[in-house]
A protein has these predicted regions:
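Short S/T/G/P-rich N-terminal loop/turn motif that feeds into the first structured element of a domain
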Residues: 1-50, 54-69, 75-92
Length: 92
């Protein structure tokens, strides 16, 4: 079952997306098995990431293999909110 992942990164700004792009994480994500979509942006106090994956396991495999190894020393991964996708509307 497809899942939605929402991650909130306090104190992070729009530079996060550029850094992820430069590190190649976004290209790796697009090629990852089970990846469906990604949207993200800065709010007044954090950077919010919303992704859709074919399964929780697909997201976890990608996150553990591509994001966790790149976290700076002393930075721990946040626990995202995840829920099963029940409706996805796209243009015809």
């Amino acid at each position: 079952m497809a899942v939605v992942m929402i991650s909130e990164l306090p104190g992070v700004d729009a530079g996060f997306a550029q850094a992820a792009r430069e590190m190649g994480i976004l290209d790796e994500m697009v090629a990852a098995p089970g990846f469906v979509s990604h949207v993200s942006g800065a709010t007044n106090s954090e950077y919010r990431v919303v992704e859709v994956w074919e399964s929780r396991e697909a997201w976890q495999d990608w996150f553990d293999g591509h994001v966790v190894p790149r976290l700076p020393p002393g930075v721990e991964a946040t626990t995202p909110e995840m829920f099963e996708l029940s409706l996805n509307i796209t243009p015809a």
